[in-house]
Amino acid sequence: MLVIFLGILGLLANQVSSQLVGQLHPTENPSENELEYWCTYMECCQFCWDCQNGLCVNKLGNTTILENEYVHPCIVSRWLNK
């Protein structure tokens, strides 16, 4: 049991250390209740608000909703210093 726990802990530590400095994990299809938090506390927040066939149709950048202006893969990237 202890060996399994240590193995899982090692895998988690490996994933965290392979992350780029200053980058948090991307989140696909963010929930609406996270929007206010991310846009308040992150210097740069980009949301895919309406994901259609893997593409972002409506995008929110900073605090302004831009409809049908950007089309890119549906992910949310939270960069600390960009």
UniProtKB/Swiss-Prot annotation:
Coiled coil: none
Glycan attachment points: 62
Signal peptide positions (record): 1-28
Induction: Expressed in the early phase of the viral replicative cycle.
Superkingdom: Viruses
InterPro entries listed in its UniProt record: ASFV_fam_110
A Pfam family reported for this protein in Swiss-Prot or TrEMBL: v110
Presence of the UniProt keyword Signal in the record: yes
Keyword vocabulary terms for this entry: Early protein, Glycoprotein, Signal
Protein name: Protein MGF 110-5L
UniProt source species: African swine fever virus (strain Badajoz 1971 Vero-adapted)
Lineage: Viruses, Varidnaviria, Bamfordvirae, Nucleocytoviricota, Pokkesviricetes
